[in-house]
Every structure is written in C-alpha cells, then in structure tokens.
C-alpha cells in the first residue's frame, strides 16, 4: 500500500507485502507507489512505465457465507467509513478483457460489499485509485493516477448518486508524470490530496475549495530527489498533516504541517538506514499518529514505525514488530486518544499475512487478524471502539476485514 504511489520501500529490502513476485521495471529510477494494484501483486511503478498486464476479472461471494465478498483480480488500496453502515473502499481491478487495470470502487452498507461503477480512462491507459475520504453519504473523494508512458492525476467525486471525474492539476505534464496517493476531506468545501510529480519527484499538494482543485506550494527537501507524499489528514479546525519520505538509496521520513497559510516541514525521527511514513491520522491538533517502516541496514528487513505528534514535536513510540520477518504499516485510523488502529503486512518465509496493531491509550499491541492466502492490508478506517474496517488484498482478489468489537473477521 501500501504500495506506495511511489513505492516507499528500502531498495533491495524484502518488502512486507504479498509473496507474489514484485514486478520491477528494467529501466528508469523506480518511483515509489506502494499501493497494491492487483490481487496479491505489489507493483513498483516507474513514472515512465505502465503497470504489468492483469489477469481476468471475476467477482464472487466466497464460500464462507453471503457476508464475505471478494473481487477477483482486484485489490483495495484505501477505505473510509462514514458510519458502520456506510463506507467506501477503492483500488484497482483487471477487466475481463483488456490489458490494463481499471478503477475499483466498492460500497459497504453494513452487511455486504457491492461494486459501484466508477470512471476509468480508456485503453491503453492504466488507472488505479490509491486513497479515499468520505465526509457524508453524499460527499466522498477518491484519488489516484492513470496513464501509460506518463502518469496523470485522477480524482473522482461521489455526490450521493454516482462517481464522477473532477478536473485536477498535473504540474508535471507533459514532460513528466504526476500522481496522487492520499486524500482527506472534512467538508464539502475543504479537502486535501497529496502525491508527487516530476522526474526527480517533488511533493504535490492539491486543495479543494468547494469549486475546484488547485496546487498549493509545498516543501520538497533533499533537493527533491526521491521526495513523495503518501498520506494526508485534515482537522476540522483547519490544520492538516501530510507524510511521506525523501531520498532514493536511503530514504528519510517526511512530515509537512499546514499552518493555515503555508506548508512547513516538521522534524521527524528517521531511524536506521532507511525509513518512510505511509499514512497519518489526527484526533486533534495535539494528537496525531503517523505510520510506516524503518530498516536498520541496507537490504535489511523492515520493521514497524510509529510516530506521535503531541502538539510540539514528533517522537517514536514503541510498536510490536515480529522477529525474523519484514513488517510494514500502511494505514492508520484513530477515533479517540485511547482508540487507534494501524494495519499492514508481515512477510516471513516469502509468505505475507495481514498485520494489525491497536492503541488503547497506553501502548500499541498486536491483534489477531485473518488472512486469505498471501495477504496484506493497505488501509483502515475506524468508526468507534466497536466498529472498524480494513482493506487490502488476499489470495487472488480484494480483501476486507471488519472489527466486531471483539475480533477481526473477513467481510
């Protein structure tokens, strides 16, 4: 998930996602887009290359019962819940015929997931949705990218009746690519979307003012080399945070704060040889969580990384990370100061399984979570202490989990 819009993984390290072989382009510097683009397949996208050819599409209800739905050939990259009976999950899926991935949007009504039609640029373009944010039953945003030789931003909006494409800036066009990885909306007139653009990768921040999307200047530290934003969260009071990483051979964590007038970089711990932040969530201006991974050495296994903002500074908080395994956190969601979830994947012996942590106000602890074949979770959205949804991929298709208040079950 998260593979990442511009895959956020330490070069050469064993990635903590699916055991399926990762496709790596043979030319060009790899840009990091860590969201998974096909079931069980983590694809590293070069800004100058298209995704690999997909398998055929099928959707079915799994044998476990009518409440368990998977979309074969697809993967969820993000999830956002308005209530226990109203949530969206987005990603990409391979069509029954055709060479490239199309957008995947599914709706949760409290009982089952159902696919909803979503715009997707035609062949030969690939199209994937990397993030989603729902404000109400009639207001939700999904963002990602499309293209072949050059990527372009893709923004969709839900008005309560249908998903429609909305124009969005592409500062890299026509000479370089532009893509979006995350979105956060707080009202019909306020939303942020983040990603990266340019052949050397610069941070990209777009703002919705109720009428149109416009680019807002944002810092690109490290000479813009390998710089990318992968997650964003906004506060009702007007503040916002965006996270990601910068650097190529050795990545450093990156956090940008919206002060109300401009984006500024805040110092963040960046342990080990390489580290990156994939997602961020805020309870208040003085209670913010960011998650990702850190590797102690070049080509070494990844470990979980959890940072907390207390209103003054970012500090690293201890988090479980299995020994003799590679583990990454790709999504995070907090409903209160004593209730937060972080999700991702753990790879051991070339097999990937879902990985879930919970914050109870005192410490992060691992919580058992089901997998479906080789699995990974790319996003999570909490509604209350007794209700949450997580989404990703497992086996040959999409995977969605639901927290019942006592355990995680496949939904």
Residue ranges and their predicted role:
Residues 1-25:
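N-terminal low-complexity Pro/Gly-rich stretches
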Residues 55-411:
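Residue-level hotspots at or immediately adjacent to binding/recognition sites across diverse folds
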Residues 9, 24, 29-36, 162, ...:
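Basic polycationic patches enriched in arginine
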Residues 2-5, 26-58:
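Secretory targeting and sorting signals
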């Amino acid at each position: 998930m998260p593979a990442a819009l511009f895959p956020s993984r330490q070069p050469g390290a064993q990635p903590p996602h699916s055991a399926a072989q990762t496709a790596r382009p043979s030319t060009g510097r790899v840009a990091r887009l860590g969201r998974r683009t096909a079931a069980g397949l983590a694809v590293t996208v070069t800004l100058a290359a298209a995704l690999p050819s997909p398998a055929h599409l099928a959707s079915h209800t799994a044998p476990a019962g009518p409440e368990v739905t998977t979309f074969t050939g697809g993967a969820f990259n993000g999830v956002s819940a308005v209530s226990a009976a109203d949530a969206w999950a987005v990603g990409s899926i391979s069509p029954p015929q055709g060479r490239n991935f199309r957008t995947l949007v599914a709706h949760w009504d409290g009982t089952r997931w159902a696919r909803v039609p979503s715009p997707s640029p035609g062949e030969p373009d690939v199209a994937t949705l990397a993030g989603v944010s729902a404000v109400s039953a009639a207001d939700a945003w999904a963002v990602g990218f499309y293209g072949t030789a050059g990527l372009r931003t893709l923004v969709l909006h839900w008005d309560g009746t249908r998903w429609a494409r909305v124009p969005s800036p592409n500062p890299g066009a026509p000479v370089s690519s532009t893509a979006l990885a995350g979105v956060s909306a707080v009202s019909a007139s306020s939303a942020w979307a983040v990603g990266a653009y340019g052949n050397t990768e610069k941070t990209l921040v777009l703002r919705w003012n109720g009428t149109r999307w416009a680019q807002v200047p944002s810092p690109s530290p490290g000479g813009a080399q390998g710089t990318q934003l992968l997650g964003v969260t906004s506060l009702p009071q007007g503040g916002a945070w965006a996270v990601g990483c910068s650097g190529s051979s050795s990545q450093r964590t990156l956090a940008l704060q919206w002060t109300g007038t401009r984006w500024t970089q805040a110092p963040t711990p960046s342990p080990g040889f390489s580290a990156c932040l994939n997602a961020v969530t805020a309870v208040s201006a003085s209670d913010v969580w960011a998650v990702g991974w850190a590797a102690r050495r070049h080509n070494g296994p990844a470990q979980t990384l959890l940072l907390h903002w207390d209103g003054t500074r970012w500090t690293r908080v201890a988090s479980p990370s299995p020994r003799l395994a590679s583990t990454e956190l790709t999504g995070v969601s907090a409903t209160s100061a004593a209730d937060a979830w972080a999700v991702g994947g753990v790879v051991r012996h070339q097999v990937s399984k879902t990985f879930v942590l919970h914050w109870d106000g005192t410490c992060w602890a691992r919580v058992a979570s089901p997998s479906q074949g080789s699995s990974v979770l790319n996003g999570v959205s909490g509604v209350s202490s007794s209700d949450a949804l997580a989404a990703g991929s497992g086996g040959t298709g999409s995977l969605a989990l639901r927290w019942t208040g006592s355990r995680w079950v496949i939904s």
